[in-house]
From Swiss-Prot:
Gene Ontology cellular component terms for the protein in this record: Golgi apparatus
Stretches with biased composition (Low complexity): 190-206
Entry protein name: Golgi-associated RAB2 interactor protein 1A
Protein family membership: Belongs to the GARIN family.
Known role: RAB2B effector protein required for accurate acrosome formation and normal male fertility.
UniProt organism field: Rattus norvegicus
Length: 295
């Protein structure tokens, strides 16, 4: 077995991410396997943790160490930041003749797949290398980085937490760059939550106004094409009364078209990201290069 027990030696190819045990690990193999086939074009950044609890001093949460693999990935490889959190439980088979040196292959069970916008990651204890993970259901995990991981791996997690909170220079956290949608979860506070809509920046209002106008025009054009097609089919078979009834039933269609268009404008983070968009020229999150790992 390799030094990092969760990483089989068969996939230890040359490369800093693989050698550190943060790329092409067991969690990546699991979700890319035919059983799941999830995010097959995206790289998974992962590490092995031990779940701990605090009772005066940090100690293992269970009598036997609860090993958890925590990872992040992107639902679309072209996204500049990860948007999916993955958690898997690791169990080691125990037999009557098994010892620490003869343990068999670990059993990986995928336990959580969560959008990162519904998860709060926090560096809770730097000296003990402990992360605090809180989910949308208020479930809180305290995870200590496995001792086999070098300190550099924990620095990667520190950088990831900072990126998720503040964003990269290519995201809307940089006021010099304007996008029509948000790539980073907004950090709500009392001042912004109570601010009326009219007090938002003019650039944000104008951008949203343009999108609303475009959505309404698109909806009206679709409605117009639908009416033309309907009139052409019924021109020789229906009476004037039938045609007038068709016009009357078209009004609900306008509201049905308009509502989803407006509803999509309230989405943030990654829902509106276009994987084919070439204007951003954003670095791929799966590259795990200078944009993520840092110097």
């Amino acid at each position: 077995m390799s030094k990092i027990r969760g990483l089989p030696p068969a996939i230890r190819d040359p490369g800093p991410g693989v050698e550190l045990g943060v790329e092409n690990g067991l969690l990546c193999q699991l979700i890319h396997s035919p059983e799941f086939n999830l995010f097959s074009d995206s790289v998974v950044f992962e590490s092995t943790f031990i779940q701990v609890t605090k009772q005066g001093n940090w100690m293992d949460a269970y009598e036997r160490s609860a090993t958890i693999i925590l990872g992040v990935t992107s639902s679309v490889p072209s996204l500049p930041l990860p948007n999916i959190l993955l958690m898997a439980n690791v169990t080691w088979p125990q037999g009557p003749f098994s010892t620490c040196s003869t343990l068999g292959a670990p059993v990986i069970t995928l336990s959580r797949i969560l959008p990162l916008k519904y998860v709060e990651l926090q560096i809770y204890d730097r000296t003990q290398r402990i992360l605090r993970v809180r989910t949308v259901t208020e479930k809180i995990y305290y995870l200590r980085l496995h001792e086999k991981h070098p300190q550099a791996v924990f620095r990667f997690w520190i950088r990831l937490v900072k990126i998720l909170q503040k964003g990269l220079s290519i995201t809307t956290k940089d006021p010099r760059i304007h996008f029509t949608h948000c790539l980073v979860p907004k950090m709500p506070n009392s001042s912004t939550e109570t601010t009326p809509e009219s007090s938002r920046p003019a650039s944000s209002q104008s951008s949203e106004t343009i999108m609303l106008l475009a959505a309404e025009r698109a909806g009206s054009s679709v409605l117009d094409l639908s009416n033309r097609h309907r009139f052409s089919e019924d021109r020789y078979t229906d009476t004037k009364t039938d045609n007038s009834s068709n016009c009357k039933t078209a009004s609900p269609v306008a509201s049905l078209i308009g509502m989803p268009m407006r509803a999509t404008l309230i989405h943030s983070l990654w829902e509106q990201e276009d994987s084919c968009e070439t204007l951003l020229q954003a670095p791929v999150a799966s590259s795990l290069g200078d944009n993520f790992l840092g110097p």
